[in-house]
């Protein structure tokens, strides 16, 4: 199963300190956390100065409860797939990312990771699913930049971030294809034993 601790360094690599770019639709951010998100989790009375003082503990709390757990990522078998889904949720919001992934999977696009969505993720051929999600995410940011011209200056950075994610098979990947492969190995071992 995927481990959130393996994703955190990948996200933090792309998130600096406090930024207040007037062209950024998210407004003031610190370590990738917007003021609106900070207020959602720690109170509507929180100020920009409170956001500037965001602690690592607060960051982890938001990351886990607002993004990782929303995607049920601990129940995703492949780490690379969990990483790219949760990072998309982090960048675009969980509902948006989950709906896009559900569209790829052909499940109901309700923005909630339930048993059917989770099963579809874990039973898909991992590399193909990862590549489809990555391609969809690249197209998504292209569309955002097209629809919001002021965001075009961020497009190359968004694409570089997405392209920094690579597929890894991972020992934890035991979806349908992993189970079939394990079964095939078991059968071969039985045959080899029989002919000894």
Residue ranges and their predicted role:
Residues 1-180, 187-196:
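Cell-wall polysaccharide-cleaving catalytic domain and substrate-binding groove, primarily
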